[in-house]
Structure formats: structure tokens, C-alpha cells
Amino acid sequence: MTVPRLVEQFELGLDAPICLTWELTYACNLACVHCLSSSGRRDPRELTTAECKDVIDTLQRMQVFYVNIGGGEPTVRPDFWELVDYATAHQVGVKFSTNGIKVDAGAALRLAASDYVDVQISLDGATAEVNDAVRGAGSYATAVRAMDNLKAAGFAGFKISVVMTRHNIGQLDQLKALADSYGAQLRLTRLRPSGRGADTWHQLHPEAGQQRQLYDWLASRGEQVLTGDSFFHLAPYGGPLPGLNLCGAGRVVCLIDPVGDVYACPFAIHEEFLAGSVRQAGGFEAVWRDSALFAELRRPAARGEGEAGGACRSCEFFDSCRGGCMAAKFFTGLPLDGPDPECVRGYGAEALKAADPVTAPRPALDHSHRSAPVPVMIGPRPGGPPGRACDENPLAGFAAAASRSR
């Protein structure tokens, strides 16, 4: 099948997602200022172990290639390893994201022994100063310790996942060198105004000149650096980058959240993009097949094509950027058929000037340890000891829930 034909098939939707993101829990030991799911505290309605296994059975029947497991911090679920083992035993590969808190020497050996599990360590700076400013004091050291354990265990090719901000764009070469030193692969992702990122996006997202710097750097690295579907909005600078150069929401990807709700995109956790629940009749398969939202997203008009096309359809670069990221537009208050807020031609920046941030949609749920926006602190470190990341145990209620699920 030719590449254009394959892209067309992706846009029309597949019988099953190529992969899906599954947030196992909102519990997390950190309070990252840009967390897409506003994680921190566990939701008592979380899927039980038995319900999670039912979802895995469905994914096996649908022949889903693999699942991206995240959170929160997924490894703090007491049944995390049980679910990973169950998935791989049922031909569903697992890639999970972690801040490294539970990746000790024993866990690293366990991971290195599996052919069907991949791990990516979240790290948002090549130095502790830059990383800890957004991920919290001590998080850099935790990630490095996890990477040391993985390297010592012989786990080759694990991923280092970096959310690009205006503060770490200048560290691209350092980040690549860090990944190379561990025999790891660097993965860069776009900062979206989702979750707590809605409060910090304007402070953190790369500026126009940095976007061009990022594009040129990625273009020169080819497939050495993974990007997923993060940067297709930059394609008008000179052509598509390696990766998925289209919005796959509801077509080839989607999200299952900790309580079983299914959203079109991991970055669009809002009732506007809620497709259903794995707890409803027919489970996940019925949601993927029959959701009215997914059917709408798979229509050509929903992508800005045809007579019903949006404002971007007349742009000469539309075939390159496809109008950009749905979630980025939605949570900055821009119309879905208009330009991406980081449109390389500047149309998004102009649209943002006219948009009212007060009326922009807010993320649906907030499980943060704090209820107020968390300021971004880039600069000299305070002289005193860091404050506690949270004043309550993020695992509260886990023991009882785990025993009920057996």
C-alpha cells in the first residue's frame, strides 16, 4: 500500500486502534505543572483488576498491537505488574511511561527479561534545574537513578520522553547525548494546553523562533529521534517529519482513562471528546465501532476537507499540517476548523490575540494535590529545602480497592 493510500486509510479510521493510551491511575507522587491529566490523587472509581483484564481481553480480540500505559504514575498501582504480565501473555504489547519512582534494580531486571514490554522515562530537561522546575524537586535524580538501573540490567533501547518547552529547546543536543550515553532512544513530544498544562501553556510553550529551531533539529536527525504525532503542525517549514503526520484522534488512537471513560485523544480530556465507557454494554469494542463522536471525526468534513472545510482549508500548506492539533486549538479557545495556536505562518498567534482565555474550555477533571494553578519557577534554586510534593498519600484507598478487585 502506498503512503498516501495508507494515510487515507488512517484518516477514515481503522477496525481497531494501532495503539491506545491507557491511564491506569490518577495517583502520582509528582505534581508536574504541565500534566495532561491533572494527576495526583487516586480516583476511587478506578477500574478494578478484573475490569482491566476484561479490557485487555477485548484488545486481544481486536488485535490491538500495543497499549501505551500511563497515568498518573502507573507503577504505583499494586496490580501494575500483574496487569503487564496479563497483557503480554495475551499478545498485547505494553509500553509504559514512568517518572522512575518504582524502577529499582529488581524492576529493571524484570523489564530487561521481557521482549514485549518497553519503558519510557519522563525527563523534561538535561539538567536538574530545568527538569525539576516543571516536574518537581528531586525528580531529575529519580529519573537518572531509574535509567542507571535499566542500563545496569542490560535493557537496551528504552526511551527518554521529553515534553518540549521554551526552557529545554536549547538542550536538544544535551538530551540526545544523554540518551546515547544510556543506549536509549530520545522521544520528543509537544506541550499541549491540556490538564494542568492549560494553566502553564502560555508560559512554557516554545516561541516561534524556537519552533523553527526544533523543526530544523528534528529534520537533521531523521528517524534517530521519535516524535509520534507531535509535530506535524511544523511540516510547512519544509516537509513532513518522521512519524504520524496527521491527527489520529478517534481514527487510529484514543484514550481510556482510569475510570474507563474513552476519549478521542489523550490530550482532549473533556466531555466534548468523550466517546463512551468500557463499562457500557459491548465494552471498548462497541465504543470504537459505534461511537457517534468517532464516526464524526472520521468524516472528511471533520478534517477540514471538502465543501464543509474550515478556515485552514484554503491555505497552501493545509496538506502538510492538516490544520494542526485539535486539543491545542480547543483548550486555547480557538475554533476547531481554524489554525493551530502554533501555526508556523503566525495565523494561530493572531487568533490567540482575539481569543478570550477566560472563556476557553477547561479540562474536565482535576485530581491535583493542589487545587490552584502551580507557578512555573525557572531560575536560581531556593536556599531552603524543597517543600513536600503533596500532603497526602497518593496511594490512599489502594489497599481496600485492590482487595475488593480480587
Kindly label every feature range from the protein language model.
Residues 1-118:
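Conserved alpha-helical substructure of the radical SAM core
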